[in-house]
Amino acid sequence: MENKPHILVVDDNAMILRNIKCILDPYYSVAVAPSGLHAFLAIGKKKPDLILLDYEMPEMNGKEVLEKLKSDEEMKDIPVAFLTSIDTKEVVVELLALKPAGYLLKPVESQALLNKVFEIIGK
């Protein structure tokens, strides 16, 4: 059994979590988390090679999750790509200011998702 790169998908929308998991599952080991708080529990169990992170979530949004990741020595090097359905100039500027590994607009097409993941983790 080959050792597949591990991806954590964080989104408060269960349908999006299922869809992204179905797209990535043939190629990667995939875990899902319905919130930022659940993401940190999942990271504690298995450190991912990439986090696909919803930008707009209740309780702890994507920006807050990324800031917490970057402030932690053990998690700061995990690449994060944002998922968002908002494509206004202001949001894009705010996203890019956080220096993510990338971002994708939702709904994301299968090939665009696979291309972005491959671009970031190279596997």
Model-predicted regions and their roles:
Residues 14-31:
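Two-component/phosphorelay signaling modules centered on CheY-like receiver
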